[in-house]
Amino acid sequence: MAKMIAFDEEARRGLEKGLNTLADAVKVTLGPKGRNVVLERKWGAPTITNDGVTIAREIELEDPYEKIGAELVKEVAKKTDDVAGDGTTTATVLAQSLVREGLRNVAAGSNPMGIKRGIQAGVEKITAELLSHAKEIETQEQIAATAGISAADEKIGELIAEAMYKVGDGKLNKDGVITVEESNAFGVNLEVTEGMRFDKGYISGYFATDVERGEAVLEDPYILLVSSKISNVKDLLPLLEKVMQSGKPLLIVAEDIEGEALSTLVVNKIRGTFKSVAVKAPGFGDRRKAQLQDIAILTGGQVIAEEVGLSLETADLPMLGTARKVVVTKDDTTIVDGAGSAEQLAGRIKQIRQEIENADSDYDAEKLQERLAKLSGGVAVLQVGAATEVELKERKHRIEDAVRNAKAAAEEGIVAGGGAALLQTASVLDDNLGLEGDEATGVQIVRAALAAPLKQIAHNAGLEPGVVVDKVANLPVGEGLNAATGEYVDLLGAGISDPVKVTRSALQNAASIAALFLTTEAVVADKPEPEAPAMPGADEMGGMGGF
């Protein structure tokens, strides 16, 4: 396919135009008074949303250079969303400000590499300052407030906070497993079931059942646990045939799955003949064996291992574990509601507790503690229902973001929300960090960008951005604008907070993409194919001229 190439200023301006188009559509949603955006669907009713990453995903531009610019900013929004579950719109607004000011200086003759170094230095300093201002989460109410802001619903915030404490046996558990499921009932309900999550994902992306979300979801699957490698499909076939006859999907957890065995599973999944997912077992050596045994007890299965005289060729369905649901991503596997005996599970938990007491080293004790947390914590399931399919998808996505947001708050603490934290750390850049020339210009660009989120929040609330920024910059640290009421308050006291992880991720990702824009000297894009000519005479249909 023929390519188009643009250089220097033309290349950067094309990218910037795409960035601006996307950012202008996304930034109107920022803050409590953010506006909505209507998204047209090919089928069904349009979707109305104010979620930045959802809007960004929908935008496809026609011009090849603008399209690339928009795609780069989508990456900022997606990366921030993946890491922290929120801050996508903030990241987009920051990226737009950094790129606009940066390109203006590059066009005036500044050295892009000098500006890039200045931006990086400024962002590092601000990140350190944000972390030093962070306040640790101490109560369930603080988690509820943070999650409630992200979900735009106080009750959902309270449920998420309750879930984080329930999977921690009454203590805040930032690593606890919380899943969000679709439900036929209206509203949002919380239940805690037996289950666990381990940090190994699917071996091949072809196993994903939902490509957009990158997930493989198995309902009521059989679970095969093997302590060795599986490469020969002949060993696996007898058992596969039995599972296929049962009509259930299959999760395979083994040391490794490769060669013919893997390709057979993938081909059958693609053809729709048989749904399965292959996952590597967590841990190494003896720890791997112990974790496989944990999963076996949780799911009511047996580990197929030569040491106990079991082999794949002789394995039968009663040796397999089962669970209500299994969700596998590229990074981890979540087993919900394993069918194992509660008595055996309690015995296993007791055994691990004794092993912790007798552990020889802190490292061994720590690893045993991780296993204990996975087995005893369970899985909190938030069941989400809504009136329509479209509303259900939007609500589920928002709650998943709020869960990640709450975990981010528990991990690194919170800072004042409403754009105030970024603006009030700007004073540490007053001396340009002792840098000079283009590097000092880079620091000034960061300083100017720190006001951008608050300006946009004020603008969306119908207030004068310049006046609001000037007022908040002169307030004590932690005080700022409550855009919902138009009053200036102690933000943390009023429950208006952001996880510091969200704020710093937004700034770091925006700076990363801005540096990329500023140092771009050429863009290579696919040349648009000419449209096929219309059928001859199509516009000469009798009596229809002029339409």
UniProtKB/Swiss-Prot annotation:
Family per record: Belongs to the chaperonin (HSP60) family.
Keyword vocabulary terms for this entry: ATP-binding, Chaperone, Cytoplasm, Isomerase, Nucleotide-binding
HAMAP family recorded: CH60 (MF_00600)
Catalysis: reaction(s): ATP + H2O + a folded polypeptide = ADP + phosphate + an unfolded polypeptide
This protein's encoding gene: groEL1
Enzyme class of the recorded protein, top EC level: isomerase
Residues that bind ATP: 29-32, 86-90, 418, 482-484, 498
Known function: Together with its co-chaperonin GroES, plays an essential role in assisting protein folding. The GroEL-GroES system forms a nano-cage that allows encapsulation of the non-native substrate proteins and provides a physical environment optimized to promote and accelerate protein folding.
Organism per entry: Corynebacterium jeikeium (strain K411)
Main location: cytoplasm
GO terms for MF: ATP binding; ATP-dependent protein folding chaperone; isomerase activity; unfolded protein binding
Gene Ontology biological process terms in this record: protein refolding
Protein name per UniProt: Chaperonin GroEL 1
Enzyme Commission code(s) on record: 5.6.1.7
Subcellular localization: Cytoplasm
Assembly and oligomerization: Forms a cylinder of 14 subunits composed of two heptameric rings stacked back-to-back. Interacts with the co-chaperonin GroES.
Gene Ontology cellular-component terms listed: cytoplasm
